[in-house]
């Protein structure tokens, strides 16, 4: 925002000369490294979540642009920060444990985790929840890790929990929605995006 020119009636912001992130034709025309671009998108968001603990929660394609500068090391412009999120420390830990349980196929511990977190109704039986989570997610985990769609896995996971009165904090809902957007955009830019390899350091 350019304060010098902004008044009560007029909001003046700098002009961003970027390429809409899903305009693949223009990204290629400017010789942007699409693999690096897609991987950096995942890194940027995960850094916001796990290191900065303040994330842009409205990262749909209309709010994300790619810079035309340094095509081999492309970077992003993100606009419209009207919706942002921040996780409590306990939810950060729970999220990391949830992903770990999924990758290890430890559905019993995953069920215990959800009950402990009060994400399901209090009379939920661990064995019943474990069975549903396994039925919804195990087949997706049979693929090589690089081919597992994180967004699809999360949707199946939470779909199975609906019958147990799934409840998530607003910031967790924002996080899940944004993660799905990020992975989807990343794979649209570079279909062979390996979300898990990029996410591993976090």
Question: Which residues are covered by each model-predicted region?
Answer:
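Conserved catalytic cores of large enzyme domains
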Residues: 1-202
């Amino acid at each position: 925002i350019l304060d010098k020119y902004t008044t009560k009636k007029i909001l003046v912001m700098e002009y961003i000369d970027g390429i809409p992130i899903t305009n693949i034709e223009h990204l290629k025309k400017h010789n942007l490294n699409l693999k690096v671009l897609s991987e950096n998108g995942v890194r940027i968001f995960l850094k916001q979540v796990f290191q900065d603990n303040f994330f842009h929660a409205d990262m749909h394609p209309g709010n994300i642009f790619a810079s035309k500068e340094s095509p081999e090391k492309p970077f992003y412009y993100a606009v419209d920060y009207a919706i942002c999120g921040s996780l409590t420390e306990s939810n950060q830990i729970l999220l990391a444990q949830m992903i770990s349980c999924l990758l290890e196929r430890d559905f019993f511990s995953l069920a215990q985790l959800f009950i402990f977190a009060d994400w399901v109704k209090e009379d939920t039986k661990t064995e019943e929840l474990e069975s549903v989570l396994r039925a919804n997610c195990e087949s997706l985990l049979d693929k090589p890790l690089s081919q597992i769609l994180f967004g699809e896995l999360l949707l199946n996971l939470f779909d199975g929990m609906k019958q147990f009165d799934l409840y998530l904090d607003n910031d967790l809902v924002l996080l899940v929605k944004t993660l799905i957007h990020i992975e989807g955009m990343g794979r649209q830019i570079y279909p062979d995006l390996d979300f898990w390899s990029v996410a591993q350091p976090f």
